[in-house]
Amino acid sequence: MGFQIAIDGPAASGKSTIAKLLAEKLGFDHLNTGATYRAVAVYLHEKGLSSSSAEEEIENVLKDLKIDYVNGRVYINGEDYTEKIQSPEAGVLASNFARLEVVRRHLVRIQREICDDKNIVVEGRDIGTVVLPNAHLKIFLTASLEARVERKLKEYQKRGLKVTKEEVERELISRDEQDSKRNVAPLKPAEDAVIIDTTSMSVEEVLDRILKLVRERMNT
């Protein structure tokens, strides 16, 4: 078994930035589980399905699904979905489908297969509680809504997407509510997670703190 690091937290808390940099620093693999959920959600949507579709219909589509995550790009049945999952709509679709037990069951199995026997940094919303409950280090990142809105807005603007601050705030509030209140694997810190509030911390400060924790765990 490799050394597994779980990083959880709400949208725009800094998970992706930190997880990617941490993996690079350590020479570990990196998995963004949110990207796998968005890709599957977009794929199901393209197949004409919604979160209110019959479970059997969704099961039939998912049972033979193949997901690959390579160098930050996500592939479904060999097709690159990376660009398709960048829109706010993809995030909303992902939150809707992620509430379904049938979707989470398939994705958790696939995510565990990707992580098996690897030194890996895995980011998401239920990594420390569901996907990798025995991870060597569990981190839960959080930040104020205001800070997260600013980060998400900059991210969208960098991609050339025209969205207002109000739209981003509504999106995050909606996603927070869905993520924390869903019946299956709600967003919450694992009991043994280290909680880090990134509101007033720089990326370097967060990274340094986690690297220190990694070194401590590796030496015990």
From Swiss-Prot:
Alphabetical list of CDD domains matching this protein: CMPK
EC number: 2.7.4.25
Organism superkingdom: Bacteria
Gene Ontology cellular component list: cytosol
Signal peptide range in chain numbering: none
GO BP field: nucleobase-containing small molecule interconversion; pyrimidine nucleotide metabolic process
InterPro entries (UniProt xref): Cytidylate_kin, Cytidylate_kinase_dom, P-loop_NTPase
Subcellular location: Cytoplasm
Alphabetic keyword roster: ATP-binding, Cytoplasm, Kinase, Nucleotide-binding, Transferase
Coiled coil: none
Transmembrane feature ranges: none
Catalytic activity: CMP + ATP = CDP + ADP; dCMP + ATP = dCDP + ADP
Keyword Cell inner membrane recorded: no
GO molecular function, one term: (d)CMP kinase activity
Binding site for ATP: G9, P10, A11, A12, S13, G14, K15, S16, T17
Family, per entry: Belongs to the cytidylate kinase family. Type 1 subfamily.
Protein name, UniProt field: Cytidylate kinase
Annotated organism of origin: Thermotoga maritima (strain ATCC 43589 / DSM 3109 / JCM 10099 / NBRC 100826 / MSB8)
